[in-house]
């Protein structure tokens, strides 16, 4: 579709206005417990975390120190400095205690008849996510966002759900200070069975010049319920909020 350049301020109306209204997203910020170290049963709902530190997410377990030059001793050869032999170095990662294992725990309520996804903006690193004692997903990379659908692991009896996250930073795993822990936001996303999944919408502008722009929109629709007809309505709005074009697709 071709439209004037000023129309590149676009809004994809999800799968229709009604579907947008049925999606909710909340930050899981407060009521977290944290402890450095590894704990065999920390993923289980009955685990006693009352003596753990109360924290707010985002949280970095190493940023407050203590600083110690021995925290990041590395026997390495820095190739960018044209070194050919390894030598003992310190301070390359800030001298902060980011190495080690840590656990985070919290609880949340979620409706049993919806689809529930957890989105982590960043978790450093090797994140193992548990819901009610069962592993939901694993993500090794600390800088990338990731998400996992946890619907099948939720309590169906109205009880709160226990979320536990195990993180591990290995020695000499970084050349700079990488951070440690749940250092970015955690989102709780609740949708209907028919929904646009996380990152399910892509908007690109493959051709742009002073006279026109081509806007390409692609949306994925997931249906975790019974098979039914699905209507997807897409609108492009002008900067003033007026509908410039509308397209409707139906799937059975």
List the model feature ranges, each with a label.
Residues 1-23:
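Bacterial Sec-dependent N-terminal signal peptides
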Residues 207-219:
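Contiguous beta-strand segments within globular domains
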Residues 217-221, 231-234, 246-247:
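Intrinsically disordered, low-complexity terminal/linker regions enriched in Pro/Ser/Gly
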